[in-house]
């Protein structure tokens, strides 16, 4: 914790914990990991669903952090995780290239010729996107769905398509736009369509280093973790 004398982490720094985290957490987790003194941290960033599949297949990281609460709850129910905690929030947005004005408002997404990238159905960002589309009038939804040119395995893939100029717009998190500096611009999703985006994490059952894993999780919901999340453009724990 914060009250440890300087250098207290050095004794345990030979312990290395593995953290499997959602792609949208890269900036935040690396920032927090640098402040965490109880162990060295090795991160793996991918779609939350991809990490969940690996854990179900027997891969044992110390900590699993997802961009939703469903997956941690499911894995907990299957006896694969300890009790999950909610540690961050985010906002789903439409991102467009900062220099490109093809899409100016949310309703433009259904215009002829607009090219869209979204997350695949199984990844949280794709699931949240489909929640938004499902709240639209049928004709509007069909027009937008008809403009989807790419379904990506994680949010980093959507950001990549945008920064490469391969698409005109994409559904990502506000923190992803924050992470690109000035490359992308946010178009807000109307409030009545906006889903609640909450991140859940848990210590993995049979984790190699459960003590340090629990300390990592405690710090994530504590001052250091919340500061790193805020600095990366995510919202606080609910």
Description of each model-found segment:
Residues 2-34, 49, 53-56, 66-69, ...:
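Exported/periplasmic ABC-transporter solute-binding proteins
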Residues 40-49:
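A short beta-strand-loop structural module common to alpha/beta enzyme folds
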Residues 59-61:
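Short acidic/histidine-rich motifs immediately flanking catalytic phosphotransfer sites
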Residues 79, 83-85:
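Central helical "cap/lid" subdomain
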């Amino acid at each position: 914790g914060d009250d440890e004398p300087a250098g207290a982490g050095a004794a345990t720094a030979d312990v290395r914990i593995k953290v499997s985290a959602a792609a949208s957490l890269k900036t935040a987790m690396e920032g927090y990991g640098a402040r965490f003194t109880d162990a060295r941290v090795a991160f793996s960033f991918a779609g939350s669903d991809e990490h969940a599949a690996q854990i179900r297949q027997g891969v044992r990281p110390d900590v699993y952090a997802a961009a939703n609460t469903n997956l941690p709850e499911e894995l907990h129910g299957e006896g694969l995780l300890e009790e999950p905690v909610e540690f961050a929030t985010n906002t789903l947005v439409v991102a467009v290239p900062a220099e490109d004005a093809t899409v100016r408002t949310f309703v433009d997404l259904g215009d002829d010729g607009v090219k869209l990238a979204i997350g695949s159905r199984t990844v949280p960002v794709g699931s949240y996107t489909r929640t938004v589309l499902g709240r639209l009038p049928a004709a509007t939804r069909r027009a937008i769905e008809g403009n989807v040119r790419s379904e990506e395995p994680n949010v980093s893939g959507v950001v990549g398509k945008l920064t490469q100029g391969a698409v005109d717009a994409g559904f990502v998190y506000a923190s992803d736009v924050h992470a690109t500096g000035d490359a992308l611009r946010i178009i807000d999703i109307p409030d009545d369509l906006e889903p609640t985006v909450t991140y859940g994490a848990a210590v993995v059952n049979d984790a190699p280093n459960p003590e340090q894993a629990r300390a990592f999780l405690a710090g994530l919901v504590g001052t250091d973790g919340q500061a790193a999340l805020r600095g990366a453009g995510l919202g606080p724990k609910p």
